[in-house]
């Protein structure tokens, strides 16, 4: 899903949404857009939600869901002339979450120190995207993008403390031009700086990953697109980067698109990818257990080849169009940072891949309007994700083998009513290897089904809606291991593979002033 914020020039002058649920969640968001003149416009986005009602339906003294309070806002500006366009903005976030045991779940029985988890995060980021058309006849243009962010996150997992402060600066200079009708060239320069400052008491022995980490990456790239006719497009690119941590590396890629007929589109791609892993910021959820964390060696940059093919069918059926999309993606890791929870049920080991690690994902979806206003969509995704854990090739734990989706949507002829229903099927998978002498969980987890539905009534400028989530009321039984003794070596709250809350009902109101 590709999500983009509304552009100030295109957004409605005012949109407001308020929402409440049976789980005690209250949320409100608003968007206001202002067109100051023909060239300059701005928009303000605000969101706040509060979900601080305690839930402990299974009576294990641990909250089924964190108590949460969050505020975020963004101010976005848009400036445009016939040859120049600029988009800039600032975003802020303040997020507070509390989980574990609280006075509500202990019911006043606080004879021992409660196991409380808290996470406070504050974030600010700014960005600016600027483009200048040099020659409209050749679609020749130059663009400059710059962004920066600061993230402050302070966490407590009972007696464990983990605080991380992240800073990022990114800049990119891009050039594009067409050479005739068949050839297009794009080239550019990139710079990225990441800095992590970490404080706490969560690692068993020293590792370079625990110190303050800073990485500078400078890169250059070129991309050539060949379109000999309306049916065929070939794009090939190469980039080279220099990292202050990993030195030089090159990243090639190629994409092919072929419109075989008016109803069949084919695509194929191949390329290489690299990624620097920051173990603790990316895996802080592991601290919600008594597992000890070990980094066994200096961790290398992750490296993988990626391949993909896809086909889209648009078939006329009884004066309507049946749309079918099928795609397959395969990732083959040359190196990967492995998080091994199988070697020891009381520890997590991080090390470089020594063996094979692959991911094969196949997805197919189809949609068809059965009759006026009624659309049916079905989708199925199969995932085969394997890695080498301590010399053994196994499927990735806590990962479903498949997911399936069936949605039905009906809108009345006058568009006053809309009814939506979604059924989601989640396949089972493998659990981390339990303790053979004292197994506290099974080796696999089962498949499960969830149902959600919503009805909307529209009026001229406002609408009301109501619905429910997880209407099948499926819940994972006792997701917290050894909840009765959270300071024991067996305690583990990360073995979560399904929903921990039952059904939720909700209702809301939307109001908007449309753009004239």
Kindly give the residue locations of the regions a language model identified:
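Repeated loop/turn-to-beta-strand initiation elements of outer-membrane beta-barrel proteins
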Residues: 13, 39-42, 83-86, 135-142, ...
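Outer-membrane beta-barrel transmembrane domain signature of Gram-negative proteins
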Residues: 113-134, 142, 148-235, 353-354, ...
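N-terminal periplasmic accessory domains that precede
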Residues: 1-17, 30-31
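C-terminal beta-signal and adjacent terminal beta-strands/loops
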Residues: 274, 376, 425-432, 456-516
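Gram-negative outer-membrane beta-barrel transporters
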Residues: 229-230, 329-332, 352-434, 510-515
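Flexible loop and strand-edge segments within Gram-negative outer membrane beta-barrel domains
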Residues: 51-72, 78-142, 148-166
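Membrane-embedded beta-barrel scaffold of Gram-negative outer-membrane proteins
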Residues: 141-147, 151-155, 259, 265-267, ...
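Transmembrane beta-strands of outer-membrane beta-barrel pores
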Residues: 18-22, 48-52, 79-83, 92-96, ...
């Amino acid at each position: 899903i590709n999500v983009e914020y509304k552009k100030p020039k295109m957004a409605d002058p005012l949109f407001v949404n308020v929402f409440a649920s049976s789980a005690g969640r209250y949320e409100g968001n608003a968007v206001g857009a202002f067109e100051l003149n023909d060239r300059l416009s701005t928009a303000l986005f605000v969101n706040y939600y509060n979900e601080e009602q305690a839930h402990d339906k299974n009576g294990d003294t641990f909250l089924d869901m964190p108590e949460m309070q969050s505020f975020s806002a963004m101010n976005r500006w848009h400036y445009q002339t016939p040859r120049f366009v600029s988009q800039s903005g600032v975003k802020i976030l303040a997020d507070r979450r509390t989980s574990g045991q609280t006075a509500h779940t202990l019911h006043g029985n606080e004879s021992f120190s409660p196991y409380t988890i808290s996470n406070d995060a504050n974030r600010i980021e700014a960005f600016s995207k600027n483009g200048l058309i040099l020659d409209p006849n050749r679609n020749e243009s130059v663009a400059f993008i710059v962004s920066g962010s600061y993230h402050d996150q302070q966490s407590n997992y009972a007696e464990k403390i983990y605080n991380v402060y992240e800073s990022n600066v990114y800049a990119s200079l891009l050039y594009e031009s067409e050479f005739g009708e068949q050839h297009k060239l794009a080239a550019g320069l990139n710079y990225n700086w990441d800095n992590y400052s970490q404080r706490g008491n969560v690692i068993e022995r020293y590792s370079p990953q625990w110190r303050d980490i800073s990485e500078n990456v400078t890169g250059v790239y070129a991309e050539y697109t060949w379109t000999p006719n309306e049916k065929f497009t070939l794009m090939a690119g190469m980039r080279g980067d220099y990292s202050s941590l990993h030195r030089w590396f090159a990243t090639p890629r190629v994409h092919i698109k072929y419109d075989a007929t008016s109803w069949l589109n084919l695509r194929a791609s191949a390329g290489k990818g690299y990624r620097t892993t920051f173990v603790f910021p990316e895996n802080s959820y592991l601290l919600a257990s008594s597992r000890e964390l070990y980094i066994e060696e200096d961790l290398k940059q992750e490296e993988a080849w990626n391949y993909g093919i896809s086909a889209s069918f648009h078939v006329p059926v009884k004066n309507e169009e049946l749309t079918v999309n099928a795609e397959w993606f395969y990732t083959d890791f040359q190196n990967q940072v492995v998080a091994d929870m199988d070697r020891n049920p009381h520890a997590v080991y991080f090390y470089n891949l020594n063996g094979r690690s692959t991911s094969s994902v196949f997805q197919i979806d189809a949609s068809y309007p059965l009759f006026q206003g009624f659309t049916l969509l079905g989708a199925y995704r199969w995932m085969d994700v394997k890695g080498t854990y301590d010399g053994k090739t196994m499927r990735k734990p806590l990962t479903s083998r498949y997911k399936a989706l069936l949605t039905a949507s009906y809108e009345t002829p006058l568009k006053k009513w809309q009814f939506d229903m979604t059924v989601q099927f989640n396949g089972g998978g493998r659990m981390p290897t339990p303790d053979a002498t004292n197994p506290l969980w099974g080796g696999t987890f089962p498949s499960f089904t969830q149902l959600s539905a919503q009805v909307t009534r529209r009026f001229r400028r406002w609408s009301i809606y109501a619905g429910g989530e997880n209407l099948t009321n499926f819940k994972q039984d006792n997701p917290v291991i050894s909840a009765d003794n959270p300071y024991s070596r067996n305690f583990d709250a990360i073995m979560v593979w399904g929903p921990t809350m039952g059904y939720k009902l909700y209702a809301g109101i939307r109001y908007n002033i449309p753009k004239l």
